[in-house]
Structure formats: structure tokens, C-alpha cells
Amino acid sequence: MAEVNPAEVSAILKQQLSGFESKASLDEVGTVLTVGDGIANVYGLANAQYGELVQFESGLEGIVLNLEEDNVGVVLLGPANEIKESSTVKRTQRIASINVGEGIVGRVVDTLGAPIDGKGAIEGETFEMPLERKAPGVIYRQPVTEPLQTGIKSIDAMVPVGRGQRELVIGDRQTGKTTVCIDTILNQKEFYDAGEPVYCIYVAIGQKASTVAAIAKTLEDKGALAYTTIVAANASDPAPMQVYAPFAGAAIGEYFRDTGRPALIVFDDLSKQAVAYREVSLLLRRPPGREAYPGDVFFLHSRLLERSAKVIDDDGIAKQMNDLPESLKDKVKGGGSLTALPIIETQAGDVSAYIPTNVISITDGQIFLTSDLFNSGVRPAIDVGISVSRVGGNAQIKSMKKVAGTLKLDQAQYRELEAFAKFGSDLDPTTMSVISKGKRNVEILKQGQNDPYPVENQIAIIYAGSKNLLRDVPVEKVKEFERDYLAYLDTKHRDTLDTLKAGKLTDEVIDTLTQTAKELSAKYKN
């Protein structure tokens, strides 16, 4: 029999006793009274705060959204199968948050930041970013002055978007809203390749899982997933997950913005978020307002979209920004931006409904897409007459501003005369000239899906259209002319395109563009 060594026994006992703490850990615990439809009423959490994360004994988490006299209303962030009446719930004493780091780029995550793409855990250092956060104050912002190139001719020319802007994309279903936003993400590859990436976040709210998978595949095939994160709350996910998905996307965007980098976020779409929020609010027995939406649905969207901003260039001031997360304070840099492209779906073109008017009033402009244009083959189907960018004009590059200055007015005039021309064929030469030029410009502004144009190519072809250099080219041959024209400039006059990209429109550049257009259009003369 082995001998017991008293010294060894006492050493083990001392080691165990040294780690003993007499302090008791106190958790504030409540009890589930009722549960159903993704909502639990909990008794006993007297000190719970609004928006706090609570944990059920099954491990499921929820967010406190209703504080009543004797109970709290908790929305569940997952299926309620394992939660029963009298289950225990404990406070976590922290606000709902998401862990963000460089490793989240190129991944598909859910509302809580958990990866759902089957590629394993998110690697590298992460920082805790709250889902709900106050927008930067006035002194931490600066005006929008840098362009965010979308690669879409009609947007970059007539409804320009700047870094830090909120530009609404609005239209009926199946008019190409998502395509406009995905093309904008694809166009940022040019900057990623140049070592100046614009980090993109695509938030899919209430969409089919197959649609999200198709978008992820498109981004991957085009090499755009290398700088993009997808946040997905699918149609099958609980309503609270759909409500908070845009906030999770905004938190990821703020990580890049606050570390001094440009980011772009697409909310696809906020109509579905509003519907999910209405569902949650009605289940919490909040009084319904217009169209049965709760009274604070405007605040839901305004507090989300106000988080998009161009942060001041001064690092010292940026470090003092209000509501900075503790985890990020040492990493803060000035000069970052978060640009938002929220999408709203209208019913039969009714832009005066409740949610569309709310979001129009919050954003810095809107891009209207119409079914009529889409069905007539004008794609992207942007109605330039009612689309506007309130702050993007200051961000447009100088060469584009000079070239496209009158384009919007010309096209509006063309649409008016085109409608008038339907009533009679006896038109004066001036009117015929405007209609002829307008038709060719419409062809120039057409663009294929997932085919963004570099800004210098846009300026070159729009210059030819706005100066009426295509008058000898038949309308059906305009796209063919465009291909030849841009290919010729790219091979023979690359320096001209580079000058345009730098924002300069010199006499020499104008001569080259004019001469090239005249030479190429001559072969189309009858």
C-alpha cells in the first residue's frame, strides 16, 4: 500500500484553499409568466433596463422591450420551443451587442454576429459593438465632399452619391432596386484592388434564403466578397431578428467608420423591417397608429439612418465622439465614413404611403425606379425627373459635373416633348432635335446587370451624348457605337481617360473625345 505523504496532502489543500472565495455571486433572476409568438412576459426583473439582453435557462437570449409595473416584455432572439412557463430568466447587465473585427469581412452572419456560411468561427481580434448606439453629434461630422462611385451612369451623372450620405432606393417590386445596390458594391472592387477598400455591408431583411445565397454567389464570383459582409435575417427567422438585423449591419459599418475607413451599407429592405417591427409591437400590445404601425416607427428608421455620417478628419476630436464603445476607444481615427443605401418597396408606385414618406424625409435624396421604364427596357429604370440627391452634388468629380451639368434637364425636357409628340407628327426641327438627342441619351444610360462602368468611361460616353455627337448614329446602333468608342479610347487614348478620372476636363481632352466620336459616328451615316 502506497504511503501518504502529509507534506504533499497539505500542499494540495493549501493550493485549493488559496483559490477559494467567500464572495457569493448574485444574479438577478426572473420567472416566465407567459410565452408565445416570440414574446415572453417575465416577472421579477425589477431592475432590468430597456434594450438589455437577458438569458433564459435554455441558453436562448432575448431583449427587454417593454417595462411594465409588475413584469417586463422580452422579445426572443430565436425559437421559443424550450421556454416554458415558470422557466428562469437572468439579467446579463449588458445591452445587445455584436462582436466585430477584420475577420468578419467576407462572411455571412446572422443578427447576433454568428457565422451562418459554414466556414467556421470568425477569426482574429474582435471588438464588442452595441446594436443600438447614438449617432455622432454635429461637431464630430463634416460635410459630404468625396464621391462614392456607384458605377451606374445615370446615378453618377444625375443623382450622385457622396461618402457619408444616405440615399434612398425606392420603387415597386421587381424594378431592379437590389441590382442597383449590388452593382454599387461590385463597383467598389476597383478601390479594393487599388488598396483603398470601401468596406461593404449588405443587410438582407426578411428575404428568401435562396435569394441571399444567390447574392452571396454573385459577390463571390465577381471577387467582391473580399471586402463585403452579409448580414442575413431570413423570412423564416423570428420577427425580432429581422428588426435588429439593420442595427447589426450598422454596428459593423461603425467599426470601419470609427477606425477611419470608408464603409457602405445596403439595407434590403426597410419596408420588411417596419413590418417585422409592427408585428413585435402589436404582440407587445403597444397601441397601433397609421396603417397599424406603432407610433415610433419613424424613430426606428431615423435612429438607424442617422448613424451614417462622414466623420471629422481630426483624430483628436474623433476620439472624443459621443457614445464610443469602450472596446474601440484606442483604435479610433478620424476621416471615416458610413454611406447608407436603404431600400423601400412601394405598392403600385405609391410613394405617399406612410413608410416611404418617413424614409424620404430622413434621407439625403432618393432614386426612384419605376415599373413602366423597367418594362419598356430602360434599365436601370431610374426616373430622373423625380430622383434627387440633396448633398451629392458637392461630392461629384469636376469632370463629371461639367459634362453632366445639363443632362438631367435635357432628359426631363425630352420626356415632356416625347409625351407631347405622341399627339402629332408635325413637329418643328428644334423639337425633333431635342427628341432625337434624348432618345440617344436614353440608350447611352442603359446598362446591363452586374456591369458597373469606371467613372472615366462614364464621362467619355456621356460627353458624346450631351454634346449631340451621336446624331448620325441610329438609335438601335448606339450601344454598338458605345462599345467601339470606349474600346478605341482605352487602346489609343488611355492618357485621356486617366485625365478624366483625375477630375480634369481640358481642351485637349475635349478635342480627343470630339474627334474620336466624329470619326466613329461617320461610319454609321447612311
UniProtKB/Swiss-Prot annotation:
Domain of life: Bacteria
Transmembrane spans: none
Location of the protein in the cell: Cell membrane
E.C. designation(s): 7.1.2.2
HAMAP family in the record: ATP_synth_alpha_bact
Binding site for ATP: G171, D172, R173, Q174, T175, G176, K177, T178
Coiled-coil parts of chain: none
Recorded catalytic activity of this chain's protein: ATP + H2O + 4 H(+)(in) = ADP + phosphate + 5 H(+)(out)
Protein name: ATP synthase subunit alpha
Family: Belongs to the ATPase alpha/beta chains family.
Physiological role: Produces ATP from ADP in the presence of a proton gradient across the membrane. The alpha chain is a regulatory subunit.
Pfam families given in the database record: ATP-synt_ab, ATP-synt_ab_C, ATP-synt_ab_N
Membrane topology label: Peripheral membrane protein
